Amino acid sequence: MKDIKVSVLIANYNNEKYLIECINSIKKQTYQNVEIIIHDDSSSDNSIKRINKYKNIIIIKNRKRGKYGSYNQMNAYYRAYKKSKGEIIFLLDSDDLFKKNKIKTVINAFLKNKKLSSLFDLPIYKYKNSLKLVKNKKKIISNFWPYIPPQSCIVMKRELFQKMINRINFNFFPDIWMDFRIGIYLKYIKKDFYILNQNLTYYRQSQEMISSNFKFSSSAWWKRRKQAHHYVKYFFFKNNIQHVKNLDYLLTNFMNYFIR
């Protein structure tokens, strides 16, 4: 196999409970030419002490955490990217894990298809002692809202990350996280939305996530959906793409009228 250098960018904030398991999932990869860069977002727990036990890990310490988690996450990955040297960029949240063959499998996919500039693998949802595999959802990418796997399933070539980051980093959509922004960019600008039909990432779901205020059809869910539509509308405007007010858009605005 061609010895392609890989950068795994890890965004961490107060995740000492899972951080060691996360790092070890990279250290134990069957593919070896990997650098690990961890951006710690002013953690108040023992995250830094745990990271310092490892050799050959680049640590970026952010002194001041911002108000919105979505902006903090984008900042973390961008700062980590600027320190990286890999040809292929893997994103990983610090409570998630890679299967030990993930990097090797993904690199093989890039080598087999030279036109690929990005891909998503499929997650395994991990909640307490239960695991749930997500099935292939390739067909859904034809919809207005593409199916977007979690953050830690995203992989892309270095040059694409650089081109993309400044075109998705609008700091006035606080409920719109980086995975959604990346998905919209790849679908409508790059037109390169490839899902690798293998479950290679353990995506951890906490009780807080299960009990989230963003439950389907809750008022918070409709408000965030409206913000997602506004993000897409602004994104289309910035990139000279015609925005069509489809049924979903009209329904979302209708529901938000009654829950204000």
Identify the role of each PLM range.
Residues 40-49, 64, 93:
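A conserved acidic beta->alpha catalytic loop
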